[in-house]
Every structure is written in C-alpha cells, then in structure tokens.
A protein has these predicted regions:
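Flexible hinge/capping segments at coil-to-helix
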Residues: 1-25
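Generic beta-sheet signal
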Residues: 5-7, 28, 73, 91
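Alpha-helix/helix-capping structural signal
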Residues: 8-9, 30-33, 59, 77-78
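Short secondary-structure boundary/capping segments
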Residues: 17-18, 44-45, 99-102
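Secondary-structure junction motif
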Residues: 24-44
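Hydrophobic hinge/microswitch elements
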Residues: 46-96
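C-terminal effector-binding regulatory domain of bacterial HTH transcription factors
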Residues: 80, 85, 93-144
C-alpha cells in the first residue's frame, strides 16, 4: 500500500485531491499507470499532459519527495518514519488510498525457473510468499 506524501510546505497548498494536479507527481518508471489510477480513484479531473517524474527506484523517488520536488507515492512502511519525524505529511490523509480496488494496487511477482525451486532458500521464500495473506492491510502506528 502507498501513502500520498509531500513536504509540509507543499502539503499546506493541497486542500483537495484536485490540488495534486498543480505539482509534479513522483513515481517509479515501472509504475507509470499508478498515478492515473490513483487520480481516477480520487475522482480528479486530469489535465492534458503528463506531470509525473519517474525514478528508477522507490528510494530515489522518496528522496525526491523529501527534497520537495513533488508529491510522492511512498510505501506505508517507509512513510511511517517520515510522517512520524515530520519530514513528510500526508495531505489527503494516511488512508486516502485504502479503498482502492485490489487490481489497481501495485503488486510484485516472484519469477523463478521451476528448477530453481530445488534450492532450499528459493523454495523457502516461495513457500513463505505463497502462504502470506497479502490482502490484509498493513497497519501503521498512530502518530505520537
């Protein structure tokens, strides 16, 4: 799950989901459809043109959000630290995206040749991933 995050200075200027369209939207290059899906979910009228900035990885995107380059989609686990410290804020609330459809939420895949499942460590990881209930929400601690 993701949380829409930005610096407090940017957050002061975001009063509604529509205000997101006034800022660069930060994401990873592999999740190009994520912002359009989120804006649609939030019923935001999307202007012509792409206001997103893509980064190679989530850590770089998070650093850009921390530097005030735009509004980022930060994983719940990473966002907790930044929200708690006050480095980032969640201008639309921490749970603005919790009711997104499961097929709109980014996932991950374990791709491994079948023969590699004979390796104990790979088999253990595969088994563990398969047994998890990935539908359950990650809960983050309340702010102090």
């Amino acid at each position: 799950p993701k949380i829409i995050c930005c610096t407090p200075a940017i957050g002061e200027r975001i009063r509604s989901a529509q205000d997101l369209t006034h800022f660069p939207l930060l994401d990873t290059v592999k999740s190009k459809r994520l912002w359009p899906d989120i804006l649609r979910h939030l019923t935001v009228e999307q202007a012509e043109g792409d206001r997103s900035i893509g980064f190679d990885d989530a850590a770089s995107m998070r650093r850009a959000a921390l530097q005030g380059i735009g509004v980022g989609l930060v994983s719940v686990i990473d966002a907790e630290e930044d929200l708690r410290s006050g480095a980032l804020v969640a201008p639309l609330g921490r749970d603005a995206l919790v009711d997104m459809k499961p097929d709109e939420v980014p996932g991950f895949y374990l791709v491994v040749p079948r023969g590699h499942l004979r390796v104990k460590a790979v088999a253990a990881l595969h088994r563990w991933l398969s047994q998890q209930d990935w539908r359950s929400d990650l809960r983050i601690s309340p702010l102090p």
